[in-house]
From Swiss-Prot:
Motif ('KMSKS' region): 213-217
The encoding gene: gltX
SUBUNIT field: Monomer.
Organism: Methylacidiphilum infernorum (isolate V4)
Protein name per its UniProtKB record: Glutamate--tRNA ligase
Motif ('HIGH' region): 12-22
GO function term, MF aspect, one: tRNA binding
């Protein structure tokens, strides 16, 4: 039965940033829809008018788009929508909810009390047949009737959730395990309306490293934080997959097409998933190094432009080469920006302690030894430069590291950075010589 062509939905509230848990819920729904060639619906639960903001709605659109989670039905950023089951904003569906509410009242399955409408909760055992958690039995014999329409005319989550799932023909409800306790009420509402409920699949919670539930107040709980840090969407999406699901062979790096091909609900773990920032960093670093440079470059261009280091007039050929050598050493876009600074600007910042250690009189002497050999190089290719420095160190009776460390500090102002010889090649002969003479003094 769970192999029917699915219609699934992601229904966030536009009241703040997109939570990591919400992003994972969206991803799992999207993967399920794509795997079975079904429909992924975006629905906006904006019934809390006092907390809704246009900015939060924009963040939902932007973050889902950044993750590559395209929706088949739902509202669009330009104010339009696509799909035949709209409106896709709950605030625009009040007449629909009133109709269903009145239907329940007419059948005496709901009643008015103190101007609010209460649903008569059946006093019986309700079974939730969950595709992940299995059969769960809820004893509702002592369950109280609950409000479905408030005295001010606004509707409570339980009714609108059920009505929208019914009207939009949702086949599978894939959501966080924290909603499991609501499910008996939802099943009771479906039965009261004479309809079969969708299939339910409650996915495990995401926990902080300490083991507590990750809440919206926790640092690192917002998708936007990872965008701002310069995480790649491919890597972040890959990591979200691992928060409750994995490939059978337990391989941790995989592309989205492989995830689509292999994703299914029975493989989702029962135990809660702990968010591991170090593993996310590792995965992002793997993607930084392994993505085709042409695929990484637009991200790098965006990060560097946002940081004010480049503009539309920047030499793209040089920039791409520089990104190509820096990406081997960094894990995030923010790190890449920091490492690119000395490559993009001739105004270098030298730490006094570093100068004393590497650019003292002895250091300058070592640089002067290297300069004539660098001046004679015609091709200025990494392999040739490496051979020259190694031969020079043998000739002068020094360690190769004596030249490497001082060249790096003289050229970047730093003790760490991209591999030296590729960096020399990318900077180019003239820029290298100019920077070295600026350190050791003008050519005699």
């Amino acid at each position: 039965m769970n192999k029917m062509i699915p219609r699934v939905r992601f229904a966030p509230s536009p009241t703040g940033f997109l939570h990591v848990g919400g992003a994972r819920t969206a991803l799992f729904n999207w993967l399920y829809a794509r795997h079975f060639k079904g429909t992924f619906i975006l629905r906006i639960e904006d019934t809390d008018q006092s907390r809704n903001t246009p900015q939060a709605l924009s963040v939902i659109f932007d973050n889902l788009s950044w993750l590559g989670l395209d929706w088949d039905e739902g509202p669009l950023p330009d104010g339009s929508s696509k799909g035949q089951f709209g409106p896709y904003f709950q605030s625009q569906r009040k007449e629909i909810y009133n109709e269903y509410c009145n239907r329940l009242i007419a059948k005496e399955l709901a009643y008015i009390k103190d101007e609010a409408v209460y649903f008569r909760m059946p006093r019986k055992r309700i079974i939730v047949s969950d595709l992940i958690c299995g059969d769960i039995y809820f004893d509702c014999s002592l369950e109280k009737d609950f409000v479905i329409r408030r005295k001010d005319g606004s509707f409570v989550f339980h009714l609108v959730n059920v009505v929208d799932d019914l009207e939009m023909q949702i086949s599978h409800v894939i959501r966080g395990e924290d909603h499991l306790s609501n499910t008996p009420k939802h099943i009771a509402l479906f039965e009261a309306l004479g309809m079969s409920p969708p299939l339910y699949a409650h996915i495990p919670l995401i926990l902080n490293p300490s083991g507590t539930k990750m809440s919206k107040r926790d640092k690192g709980s917002s998708v936007q934080e990872y965008i701002d840090e310069g995480f790649l969407p491919q890597a972040f999406r890959n990591y979200l997959c691992l928060l409750g699901w994995s490939l059978k062979e337990n391989r941790e790096i995989f592309g989205i097409e492989e995830a689509i091909a292999k994703f299914d609900l029975p493989q989702i773990h029962r135990s809660n998933a702990r968010f591991n920032h170090q593993k996310l960093l590792w995965i992002n670093g793997e993607y930084m190094r392994s993505l085709p440079l042409d695929e990484l470059y637009p991200h790098a261009f965006f990060w560097l432009k946002k940081a004010g280091l480049i503009d539309q007039n920047t030499d793209c050929s040089f920039l791409k080469q520089a990104v190509g050598i820096v990406r081997e050493k960094v894990k995030t876009g923010k790190e890449l920006v920091e490492w690119m600074k000395p490559l993009l600007s001739d105004t270098l910042q030298y730490d006094e302690a570093v100068v004393q250690q590497y650019l003292d009189d002895k250091g300058k002497e070592i640089l002067r030894e290297a300069l004539p050999y660098l001046e004679e190089v015609s091709s200025f290719q990494a392999k040739e430069l490496e051979a020259i420095i190694k031969n020079l160190s043998l000739k002068m009776g020094r360690k190769t590291a004596d030249y490497i460390h001082r060249l790096r500090v003289a050229l970047t102002g730093r003790t760490v950075g991209p591999s030296l010889y590729p960096m020399l090649e990318v900077l180019g002969k003239q820029k290298v010589l100019n920077r070295l003479y600026k350190v050791v003094g003008p050519k005699e």
